Amino acid sequence: MDISRAEQRILHLLAQGGRIDLVRDEAGKLTDAHCYSRDGWRYTGLDMALFRKLKRRRTIASERGQPYRITRRGLQLVRSQPDNC
């Protein structure tokens, strides 16, 4: 399965130890998703449409309320590259 360049960038960042944190409003509805590198830097290339696409393809998952991380399937799909360019 081919994945887009934007998906590739997010998965590569997650494969290096990054995470995706969800932002919810007062009613508990999902409003935004923030992607962080392992160093704590926020990556701005993640929007809700891309988050849903990654989740639907089962390349990311959350366990026990923790931030979203890359799955084994996501690791198989990601291609190696020296940086996130």
Swiss-Prot record:
Disulfide bonds: none annotated. It holds the Pfam family YjhX_toxin. Transmembrane segments: none annotated. Signal peptide: none annotated. NCBIfam families: PRK13687.1 (NF010240). Belongs to the UPF0386 family. HAMAP family: UPF0386. This is UPF0386 protein HNE_3437. It comes from Hyphomonas neptunium (strain ATCC 15444).
